């Protein structure tokens, strides 16, 4: 490792040279109490910026051991430091001038949820922060003094004010850690109390707009109905009161615009911890919960959907069903089976985004179209056994059909944004209109031995010889999906993906699986289990192409890993 003085000399020696001379700077340099690494140098000033990292030893950083005692506190601390670092570098970004991206200093932008990102990682050795710098140039000629200003003036100030405990707002960090530990305590108590979710009194559920996840100002705070009100005991905040949603089948009903979908949206994102001031800090959902919807046109490969669909007129085998263009009902059936495979114990559904013929068939329709002519066993007839046999609870928003009233264990009416427990009232009415007994096919747990086929790279021969295989390249399209090689992976309807960096990580994982794990024998669960173990022990660096991992990735849940793999068109 070289000293910072060597970097300064090297910089001065390449001033006004052609831009590729910047590549000679690649390496690690000792800057007092931290190490600066130039991991990748951009090809020209208009290309993606250079990849930089800094490492501060645990001793020099000086953070209390309690803040990195487990995975929860490490992720929370890293998230907090990333937010602080972004605030610091925003003061200096583009203050060094030049062409293209000259002077850019950027890091991951964190939203309302707390994610494990490669932008900052806490290990037993210390803190590693990763970010981007646009190396300055005039045209395509190196402007060394401007980069010197960034590396020797701007960056040291940002690092000192972010990654050293003595220099930060210690009380603010303590409250951040305490909040995370309180949130974790609620998650643990959900299981003890046989709940699928908790919504604290005073929570602010509505968001600012359709393109903002910030809380809406002047909105109605959440108040729990007395019959569902419970108390959670938290290690730092003490007692907190709110609505506990029991395991089983819960129906959320109400008039239009009364807050049904707003509550469901808060619950679907309750699988993540939220930052202080978000309004949903204490909206906590079972972390395996999966939002499901119909998804016309998606790809399905070898999924046993026979629990819901059988005896298709084209004689297609629904025990191992495949299609490149799923209907609404088959896509939703596949989503449920795939969710079971991913270990989800709670399904979240909204009537508005579900396939009607998949969810319910009323008595009139059953009289007109006999069961022998209908291949679909509706979700209505499977929801109870999903809970009693498979242990999977359902939260369903309904606004037009009362079909689920008979089977629901808990019924919540949203009335002017306030929840009301109407279970007893509805059950009394249901008693006047008993359900006719239906001949429902036996509930048989689906079978799964699905595999991902081995990747066959495209071979290009240039002139003579056999040519070399193309490596799979990833192009991320925000949260919506990514292009892997020539194959588009569409994730638009995977609604619990909240950050493009999660999508980027999914591309990385799928690429690795296709290149190193898929052999035509390993099942998807076997592959995902291997990936999960690697993430737990090594992090995403285990799947990087080179010797370093850049900023720009966030670890997704196992449910989203399955969702991604299931949407890859083999």
What feature does the model see in each segment?
Residues 240-272:
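Glycine-rich phosphate-binding P-loop
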Residues 320-354:
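Phosphate-binding/switch loop-helix module in NTP-utilizing enzymes
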Residues 1-185, 189-194, 205:
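N-terminal accessory targeting/assembly segments
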Residues 298, 308-329, 361-376:
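Flexible beta-alpha connector loops of hexameric P-loop NTPases
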Residues 206-241, 276, 284-289, 293-300, ...:
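N-terminal pre-Walker A segment at the start of P-loop NTPase domains
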Residues 340-383, 387, 400-406, 410-427:
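Conserved P-loop NTPase nucleotide-binding/switch module
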Residues 388-391, 397-570:
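Conserved NTP phosphate-binding and transfer environment spanning the P-loop NTPase/kinase superfamily
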Residues 193-195, 201, 257, 264-295, ...:
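Carboxylate/His-rich catalytic cores and anion/metal-binding grooves
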């Amino acid at each position: 490792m070289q000293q910072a003085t060597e970097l300064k000399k090297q910089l001065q020696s390449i001033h006004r040279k052609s831009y590729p001379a910047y590549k000679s700077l690649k390496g690690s340099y000792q800057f007092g109490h931290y190490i600066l690494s130039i991991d990748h140098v951009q090809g020209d000033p208009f290309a993606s910026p250079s990849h930089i990292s800094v490492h501060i030893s645990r001793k020099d950083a000086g953070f209390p051991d309690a803040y990195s005692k487990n995975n929860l506190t490490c992720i929370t601390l890293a998230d907090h430091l990333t937010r602080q670092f972004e605030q610091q570098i925003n003061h200096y970004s583009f203050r060094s001038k030049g062409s293209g991206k000259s002077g850019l200093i950027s890091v991951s932008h964190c939203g309302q949820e707390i994610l494990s990102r490669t932008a900052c990682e806490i290990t037993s050795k210390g803190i590693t922060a990763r970010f981007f710098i646009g190396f300055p140039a005039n045209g395509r000629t190196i402007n060394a003094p401007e980069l010197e200003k960034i590396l020797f003036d701007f960056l040291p100030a940002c690092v000192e004010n972010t990654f050293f405990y003595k220099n930060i707002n210690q009380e603010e960090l303590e409250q951040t850690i305490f909040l995370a530990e309180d949130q974790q305590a609620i998650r643990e108590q959900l299981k003890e109390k046989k709940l699928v979710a908790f919504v604290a009194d005073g929570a602010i559920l509505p968001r600012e707009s359709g393109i903002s996840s910030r809380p809406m100002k002047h909105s109605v705070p959440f108040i729990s109905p007395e019959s569902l009100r419970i108390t959670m005991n938290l290690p730092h905040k003490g007692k907190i009161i709110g609505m506990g949603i029991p395991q089983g089948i819960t129906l959320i009903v109400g008039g239009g615009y009364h807050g049904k979908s707003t509550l469901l949206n808060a619950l679907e994102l309750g699988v993540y911890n939220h930052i202080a001031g978000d309004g949903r800090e204490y909206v906590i959902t079972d972390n395996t919960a999966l939002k499901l919807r119909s998804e016309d046109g998606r790809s399905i490969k070898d999924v046993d959907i026979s629990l819901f669909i059988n005896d298709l007129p084209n004689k297609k085998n629904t025990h191992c069903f495949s299609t490149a263009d799923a209907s609404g009902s088959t896509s939703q059936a596949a989503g449920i089976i795939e969710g079971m495979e991913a270990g989800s114990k709670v399904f979240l559904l909204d009537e508005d985004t579900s396939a009607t013929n998949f969810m319910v068939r009323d008595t009139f329709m059953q009289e007109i179209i006999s069961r022998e002519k209908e291949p679909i066993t509706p979700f209505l007839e499977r929801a109870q056994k999903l809970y009693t046999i498979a242990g999977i609870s359902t939260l369903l928003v309904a606004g037009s059909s009362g079909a689920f009233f008979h089977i629901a264990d808990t019924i919540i009416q949203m009335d002017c944004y306030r929840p009301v427990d109407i279970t007893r009232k509805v059950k009394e009415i249901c008693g006047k209109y008993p359900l006719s007994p239906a001949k429902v096919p036996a509930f048989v747990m689906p079978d799964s031995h699905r595999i991902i086929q081995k990747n066959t790279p495209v071979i290009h021969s240039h002139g003579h010889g056999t040519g070399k295989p193309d490596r799979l390249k990833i192009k991320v399209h925000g949260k919506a999906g990514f292009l892997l090689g020539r194959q588009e992976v569409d994730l638009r309807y995977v609604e619990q993906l909240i950050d493009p960096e999660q999508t980027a990580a999914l591309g990385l994982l799928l690429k690795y699986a296709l290149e190193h794990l898929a052999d035509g024998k390993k099942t998807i669960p076997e592959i995902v289990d291997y990936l999960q173990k690697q993430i737990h022990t090594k992090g995403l660096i285990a799947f990087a192409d080179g010797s370093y991992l850049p900023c720009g990735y966030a670890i997704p849940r196992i449910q989203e890993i399955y969702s991604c793999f299931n949407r890859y068109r083999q």
